[in-house]
Amino acid sequence: MPETWSNEQIIADSLGRAADVEIGGSHSGWRLSRWRQFVGTYSLTGLPDPLFVVHISGKRNIKTWERDCWSERHSIPGLATIVPAGQSTSWLVDGELDVVTLSIATNRLQNGQARDQFDRMRFAFSDPLGVALTRQVLSELYQPETPERDVYVSTLVDALRAHMLRGPAQPGEAS
């Protein structure tokens, strides 16, 4: 293993298996991965880069550890979470975990607004555009590889990255 682990290496080590499917890499400044497996609880050390997570399907009522207990709030399929770089997390699944993660290289968060989107944990929030783009990318990744599909997936991921760097609406903001 390299001296500095990527988000995906840390997640794979914690879950005990690699992502089901993934695209992107260090050269592109992002990596999108799907994680599916049955799990009880798991913990992640602080990740080197921020993470946008979409709860795709599987177990409802996933919780995260907050201060000294499991969160009252829970995630269901269709909700999103942002995990900032460096923050350790623990998760209570007790069933099938099915999430997609988008890692964005910290050095790609150039302006203040982009950095601000990833400076704190946001658990189980509604982001219809981010979720829709993620689901569409995911469905395309299971299609046969063609040059046209690759261009389409790249364009969708660029749109998702632009959306994330601009930032999903915060609670209380006008839509």
Regions from the language model: what does each represent?
Residues 1-15:
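OB/S1-fold single-stranded nucleic-acid-binding modules
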Residues 20-120, 146:
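N-terminal regulatory/effector-sensing and dimerization cores
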Residues 115-174:
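Amphipathic alpha-helical segments enriched in hydrophobic/aromatic residues interleaved with Lys/Arg
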